[in-house]
Design a protein with these regions (language model features):
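A C-terminal functional module that forms or caps the active site or interfaces directly
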Residues: 43, 157-207
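Short, acidic/polar
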Residues: 12-24, 67-75, 136-146, 191-198
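Conserved anion-binding
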Residues: 2, 68-72, 77-153, 161, ...
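C-terminal helical cap(s) of enzyme catalytic domains, especially alpha/beta-barrels
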Residues: 95-101, 105, 200, 213-232
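Hydrophobic faces of well-ordered beta-strands that scaffold small-molecule active sites
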Residues: 3-9, 31-33, 56-60, 84-86, ...
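Glycine-rich phosphate-binding active-site loops on the catalytic face of alpha/beta enzymes
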Residues: 79-91, 182, 189-222
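Structural motif
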Residues: 26, 52, 79, 150, ...
Length: 232
């Protein structure tokens, strides 16, 4: 059984985001706040959505020198989000520094997740653009092992890799998987995709779903369909 469906609120403004969330009068979705919304509205939007009772995945994908990431994570830890992330390509030293910065004085912290390869990346673009010639699944497994060794809680990966990650790193190591679409839906710019039911079957812990819910004619019904396929 999947742990939860995370709704990617990729809106450009506070007004659009809150208008969308106002539709959900029952179960409050776990919300992903990405770069567009965070850069437009700042920490205030995180605090406001949190105050409404939503869990939050703050998806900023930090990637910089270790000390800079450590200081940034120390600031993010004050926002009381539930999950945040960084790029595994930043090295184990950066990931360890991030954990140190994210951990509060009382020892608590949000879950910290590493991004491996974006679901918009395929083998051809990885080789031609990034000059990484290993098979994409091997790269994901390598990044997963590095993240686990650094002490992180899991990774963001394609649902196609979730089962293999659990085999390598254990069931405790979380997999958060975007690239999820309904069987009758448009895949958009995602190149490695799977349905909610298939992601559940293969062992994804969380799925991140954006446009199939946010752009649906009935977002609440689309969300409930996702929950039914993945969580129930």
């Amino acid at each position: 059984m999947g742990k939860d469906v995370i709704v990617a609120c990729d809106f450009a403004s506070r007004e659009a985001t809150l208008n969308f969330l106002d539709k959900f009068t029952g179960r409050k979705p776990f919300v992903k706040i990405g770069m567009e919304l965070y850069y437009a509205e700042g920490p205030a939007i995180v605090k406001e959505i949190k105050a409404r009772g939503h869990k939050i995945f703050l998806d900023l994908k930090l990637h910089d020198i270790p000390n800079t990431v450590k200081k940034a994570m120390s600031v993010l830890s004050r926002l009381d989000v539930d999950i945040t992330n960084l790029h595994a390509a930043g090295t184990k030293n950066m990931m360890r520094a991030a954990l140190e910065g994210l951990t509060r004085e009382d020892g608590t912290r949000p879950l910290l997740i590493a991004v491996t390869q974006l679901t918009s990346t395929d083998q051809e673009s990885m080789e031609n653009d990034l000059m990484i010639h290993a098979p994409i699944d091997e790269v994901v497994m390598h990044y997963a092992a590095c993240a686990e060794e650094a002490g992180l809680d899991g990774i963001v990966c394609s649902p196609l890799e979730a089962g293999k990650v659990h085999e390598k790193c254990g069931k405790h190591f979380l997999t958060i998987t975007p690239g999820v679409r309904f069987a009758d839906g448009d895949v958009g710019d995602q190149k490695r995709v799977m349905t909610p039911a298939a992601a559940k079957a293969i062992g994804s812990d969380y799925i991140v779903v954006g446009r199939p819910i946010t752009a649906a004619s009935d977002p609440v019904a689309a969300y409930e369909r996702c929950v039914a396929e993945f969580c129930d």
